[in-house]
């Protein structure tokens, strides 16, 4: 585990974004942990979050030309990541996002910000079913000269859907692009094992991983 990954997990726990207990997911599964990126809801938290996304980009080495934040949650994520890349990695890159509904007046269209062209890195919080990413892929495919370079998310739950694959593995298979994350469940487990206060949650998370993991 990289230092920035350990720092991110601690940061997520401190902000109440990553919690341990008993949570019912939309899928109906009872999960021993829950991740709610909507709680990165202050200026300081968003700035720190951008630095973690930027660190994951630097670590991945994925080449790309533009950052894309899917509406709505991806918009501030792409913005703060672009700021962090410029301020901490000396990479001043364009970024853009989509509207849920296209405007008929003013600047018009469904895309806002830099032109969506070249290799596109999609920024989001998590991939649950993959539906949102599939919609984004259609948007990118509709733009001349644009193609997806990859997807970056905060947490990879490493959890299968209804079949044998996770939603992330299905996206990688169907579109031939990498999906990278700041951290995965593997690193969360490693963090729990090393933390005296949180170690009590390790057996439940390991059992969940054994049942639903990929």
From Swiss-Prot:
The keyword Repressor belongs to this UniProt entry's keyword annotation: no
Top-rank EC class of the record's enzyme: transferase
Binding annotation for 5-phospho-alpha-D-ribose 1-diphosphate: 26, 72-73, 99-100, 103, 105, 124-132
Keyword Magnesium: yes
InterPro entries with a match to the protein in the record: OPRT, Or_phspho_trans_dom, PRibTrfase_dom, PRTase-like
GO biological process: 'de novo' pyrimidine nucleobase biosynthetic process; 'de novo' UMP biosynthetic process; pyrimidine ribonucleoside biosynthetic process
Reported cofactor(s): Mg(2+)
Catalytic activity line of the entry: orotidine 5'-phosphate + diphosphate = orotate + 5-phospho-alpha-D-ribose 1-diphosphate
Listed pathway(s): Pyrimidine metabolism; UMP biosynthesis via de novo pathway; UMP from orotate: step 1/2
Entry EC no(s): 2.4.2.10
Record keywords: Glycosyltransferase, Magnesium, Pyrimidine biosynthesis, Transferase
Annotated Pfam families: Pribosyltran
Binding site for orotate: 34-35, 128, 157
SUPFAM superfamilies with a match to the protein in the record: PRTase-like
PROSITE patterns according to UniProt: PUR_PYR_PR_TRANSFER
Record GO terms (molecular function): magnesium ion binding; orotate phosphoribosyltransferase activity
Recorded GO CC terms: cytoplasm
Signal peptide as annotated in the record: none
Homology family: Belongs to the purine/pyrimidine phosphoribosyltransferase family. PyrE subfamily.
Task performed by this protein: Catalyzes the transfer of a ribosyl phosphate group from 5-phosphoribose 1-diphosphate to orotate, leading to the formation of orotidine monophosphate (OMP).
Subunit structure: Homodimer.
Protein name in UniProt: Orotate phosphoribosyltransferase
Species for this entry: Pseudomonas fluorescens (strain Pf0-1)
